[in-house]
Amino acid sequence: MNLLNLFNPLQTAGMEEEFDAIKIGIASPETIRSWSYGEVKKPETINYRTFKPERDGLFCAKIFGPVKDYECLCGKYKRLKFKGVTCEKCGVEVTLSKVRRERMGHIELAAPVAHIWFLKSLPSRLGMVLNMTLRDIERVLYFEAFVVTDPGMTPLQRRQLLTEDDYYNKLDEYGDDFDAKMGAEGIRELLRTLDVAGEIEILRQELESTGSDTKIKKIAKRLKVLEAFHRSGMKLEWMIMDVLPVLPPDLRPLVPLDGGRFATSDLNDLYRRVINRNNRLKRLLELHAPDIIVRNEKRMLQEAVDSLLDNGRRGKAMTGANKRPLKSLADMIKGKGGRFRQNLLGKRVDYSGRSVITVGPYLRLHQCGLPKKMALELFKPFIFHKLEKQGLASTVKAAKKLVEQEVPEVWDILEEVIREHPIMLNRAPTLHRLGIQAFEPILIEGKAIQLHPLVCAAFNADFDGDQMAVHVPLSLEAQMEARTLMLASNNVLSPANGEPIIVPSQDIVLGLYYMTRDRINAKGEGSLFADVKEVHRAYHTKQVELGTKITVRLREWVKNEAGEFEPVVNRYETTVGRALLSEILPKGLPFEYVNKALKKKEISKLINASFRLCGLRDTVIFADHLMYTGFGFAAKGGISIAVDDMEIPKEKAALLAEANAEVKEIEDQYRQGLVTNGERYNKVVDIWGRAGDKIAKAMMDNLSKQKVIDRDGNEVDQESFNSIYMMADSGARGSAAQIKQLSGMRGLMAKPDGSIIETPITSNFREGLTVLQYFIATHGARKGLADTALKTANSGYLTRRLVDVTQDLVVVEDDCGTSDGFVMKAVVQGGDVIEALRDRILGRVTASDVVDPSSGETLVEAGTLLTEKLVDMIDQSGVDEVKVRTPITCKTRHGLCAHCYGRDLARGKLVNAGEAVGVIAAQSIGEPGTQLTMRTFHIGGAASRAAAASQVEAKSNGTARFSSQMRYVANNKGELVVIGRSCEVVIHDDIGRERERHKVPYGAILLVQDGMAIKAGQTLATWDPHTRPMITEHAGMVKFENMEEGVTVAKQTDDVTGLSTLVVIDGKRRSSSASKLLRPTVKLLDENGVEICIPGTSTPVSMAFPVGAVITVREGQEIGKGDVLARIPQASSKTRDITGGLPRVAELFEARVPKDAGMLAEITGTVSFGKETKGKQRLIITDVDGVAYETLISKEKQILVHDGQVVNRGETIVDGAVDPHDILRLQGIEALARYIVQEVQEVYRLQGVKISDKHIEVIIRQMLRRVNIADAGETGFITGEQVERGDVMAANEKALEEGKEPARYENILLGITKASLSTDSFISAASFQETTRVLTEAAIMGKQDELRGLKENVIVGRLIPAGTGLTYHRSRHQQWQGVEQETAETQVTDE
């Protein structure tokens, strides 16, 4: 198997080989011989005395070419003038020695050998074609059995296996009427005599006639392989090799080490084994050796060739002298160190260097400091050129000398060369495109690169010893691209969310915050100033302080009708610091943006506003000035930390005493048996959690205020100037949670498994921890450190998979013209609007007109890009939902269109053609991956578990509405008890817009009615957070069934209290098999002792107790509707094992089926229950036409529907995690997209990471890019095969044009790994994972790679079809088409 020779430099010397696609196939023996320059007959490599290659050996100069340039081996012909002569003495052609890198040899095998990839790469292709099992084929190949190749007139079957004894018996019986062979010859004979076309016909007929699914799948697979062979014109017997190609010797070198030893490539060993065994076999055949010996030798030859191709795939791996498995040809290309990932995708480049980075606070945003020494080395060729040009040096050698001596002129020339020549800085790991940015170098002394502080966030760099790499763009085009696209000052916005990434942090924030804070009664309060200059003078002469409140006249610039700036003078009440800051504001940015204490969030908003109002250039200048100012005032402010800044609240002792008393009370209740151990633990944890919060609140209240005397002599509170508080409040460093640990109490700690230790750490760091407290704390903290190490690798792998699945998605056209899209609403969770509608639709293109709900007039027409102005207008008009275009519904075939994608987040305008939106999406999702948690539950070292919620309150005034799934009954006390599983109370405002949505659990008590007007803060429902009740919907007298103590229920007596309760035992733990199936249930009787039935049916009421339930009713007890039958204790304070963080994101993108998946209704209809089987319940849904759909559900699962309930298709009927494949099948693409986007966003939102929905949608598009053919119609597809969506669309269009029947297909969801591997490009798939399998499959299919994606083009070394490369590829394409048309025309004229 060989990638067909792309580059043969000898044939195409001086001419660039142009190609548009790469085809892979199986090489025929003739092809292999045609590549070869001669047969390798001997296993020898080089002569040990002369070090010259042996003739006919593995390094033979006659076959592979001369060892030295233009010199034959015996030395008869030397020098260029004999070029092309073949020496008659040694037979070597006189030419360049580098031909030894490309000339191949071959080995003529004495017996055919099966190619291991087609045999052992699962599913076995040989097995598939021959319809034999792998085990059978192996028995034949490795000489354990005969296979009948031609049964002749005997009753034997073709492909039947015979043992040796059988074979000889049959020979006696039938003579030579039949043919049976052993080894690869037998298999080759079978392959050769297989009639491919006939077999395809038979299979197609079978496919139509068969009914079983498994059979259809099996036939379809086999059909696909045979059709591929038929189509590509490759012969089946080529999978068995007669000739083995030999790799050119310089690709498997033999290097002499000192001391007369040699370092050699493992391939030489493997080849030698093959040649040795092959030669031995030839000799044995000539001698007519006994069969058994020949057979053994053939088997050994087969094994040697197996090892050469893929060592270790079958049997034990061949090892070298040092017991290490030898590296075979397959190992050369696969894995991280293989050809693809190491050499083709991970090339190293010249003109680069690396050094440690330090701060460059005086730099401008587009500059970086480059050490002179580095610059001299990096720009050497440029300097040589200039030195020669100026006549300072006559030759390169002389120039080199001057540079080495570092004469003064060299430095002047270096300055010239470097002027306006951008360089690129990169910090590993490069997680997103901002990890490489271009800067203009400024020469500096010293040896460290100086980096602008504001770009640190993008590089994720700090100055604790980080290193960065420098690269020099050489060509003019490269320099231009670096300057226009990559210059740091052109990358102000983050491509992940469109917000500024050039945002001041730490010292700068602290300085700006300190500068813009106001003080009460500072020196000179209430002064009036005519302009800022006057403020400056007053400040410098110490007449006023930085925080003094003053009134000042400020000149602002406002745009007039013509769009030009005009000065407007306003009076402002402000502070000295803010007035000084107003000087650096760009034109057009109103003063009110800085007329407040600037915290980190405010500064971010300020820069964002500046970008939107004043444009890129002014923003960059403004950011730089902010930085200089911030650093200046941070230095002048002299803010530092002292132990006294950590003020411990006076109330702490009292609060601790109170909590201890409560805990003691709970312990007492537990001793008296009023609460279980689990409840006691939960309550204790809750008490300590609350105590910690109270202390933290007291501490923050104490820290954040300080008493001062105002101008009138009264004592007033003002915001504190405590250093620690200022650092946290400004967002420069630290958070309330950390201050709480410094001067409040450390609080509850978690064990590594996530459970909370019930004794909290009551001290803080200022008081110091006792040994025990310290020990408790270390437990969780170490887990955190171990986690971080794992997290990085996992996050990197997720990014790699994401990039791989989206790498070929590029914007290729402006508008695909579709009117499809998704409807966007605000995301409401609990009482909060988590993401407003305006944020979700900003930068999208509308798919249909947006209409004002009150007046009915069109606000925005379809096909409009929604800018900030438009979304604000939509927001004010009270529109609830907007239909926008999305990448998922884009109709463009290979790529996306600009309108479906919308705004390029990093540039703030509609995306350009050629933007690699796929990779950007992958990076935006992958880059914050390291910030996500690895744990399943998110608890830091300090347990940040909110006390369990036990009620919901309204956050705003409005009307309460119950959701459609709401079900409740009224109990004897008149309370409304919820008995539905997915119930929600929704609150609408006066216009009827949804403002809040609250989930209400099963068993909650509702305190409001449907349609009732409510006030903010009103409680809507309450419930017990620690147990889950089991509630009856019917009244009657209790009658138990299967309630046998010790069999189905156990009496649990608490050791401490001596009280006993009945608890249901898990069926799996029961002793006898009969009792495993018994379920304790409760029936209800009326006053006459007759079983009560479900109203409207004849089915008696029967409720089964789930495992672990604590039963709270007695036999014969009268109960009413809504009463509790049993309580199921919730797992103790481990928050329910929710997969969170990184694993959750990976799970969603891999589209994994969850373990205990819930079930969705397959059809719309009415629910009823059928006859139960052992351990399963039968649920039936009958639709309107009376068609019933049955499903069996395990009794352990919770069914969320009841008899007679009407369910809609796609509604949840069994509790559990949702399976995304079900959502796609039953609810469609939009519902699926909404589910994945929301779930992924939830994980990131928890960590405070903002990512645009767009990026997730781009990935979903790639997960949905293949479809399953349900009915092939007349399109030539096979029913049941998976194909690219674009291919089906194209085939269907063609079929409809020709009046044929189009194919029907269903959408399928592929996980990202699967989707990457199933891409059309085999080069991209092979370089991702499972290289062997991908290449084997591609070779059999005779696949052609059209080189559409980015990865394939990088691998073959062309410009990528994205960005500036897209235009290059397009123009080349047009040229080709022009050439083709011309040739066609000339042919016509010739004829």
Swiss-Prot record:
The keyword Acetylation does not apply. It catalyses: RNA(n) + a ribonucleoside 5'-triphosphate = RNA(n+1) + diphosphate. Zn(2+) 2 binds at C816, C890, C897, C900. Pfam families: RNA_pol_Rpb1_1, RNA_pol_Rpb1_2, RNA_pol_Rpb1_3, RNA_pol_Rpb1_4, RNA_pol_Rpb1_5. One of its GO terms (cellular component) is DNA-directed RNA polymerase complex. Gene3D superfamilies: 1.10.132.30, 1.10.150.390, 1.10.1790.20, 1.10.40.90, 2.40.40.20, 2.40.50.100, RNA polymerase II, clamp domain (4.10.860.120), RNA polymerase Rpb1, domain 3 (1.10.274.100). CDD domains: RNAP_beta'_C, RNAP_beta'_N. Keywords: DNA-directed RNA polymerase, Magnesium, Metal-binding, Nucleotidyltransferase, Transcription, Transferase, Zinc. Zn(2+) 1 binds at C72, C74, C87, C90. One of its GO terms (biological process) is DNA-templated transcription. It comes from the Bacteria. Binds 1 Mg(2+) ion per subunit. InterPro entries: DNA-dir_RpoC_beta_prime, DNA-dir_RpoC_beta_prime_bact, RNA_pol_asu, RNA_pol_N, RNA_pol_Rpb1_1, RNA_pol_Rpb1_3, RNA_pol_Rpb1_3_sf, RNA_pol_Rpb1_4. Mg(2+) binds at D462, D464, D466. Its EC number is 2.7.7.6. One of its GO terms (molecular function) is DNA-directed RNA polymerase activity. Its cofactor is Mg(2+); Zn(2+). The RNAP catalytic core consists of 2 alpha, 1 beta, 1 beta' and 1 omega subunit. When a sigma factor is associated with the core the holoenzyme is formed, which can initiate transcription. Belongs to the RNA polymerase beta' chain family. DNA-dependent RNA polymerase catalyzes the transcription of DNA into RNA using the four ribonucleoside triphosphates as substrates. PANTHER family: DNA-DIRECTED RNA POLYMERASE (PTHR19376), DNA-DIRECTED RNA POLYMERASE SUBUNIT BETA (PTHR19376:SF54). HAMAP family: RNApol_bact_RpoC. This is DNA-directed RNA polymerase subunit beta'. The gene is rpoC.
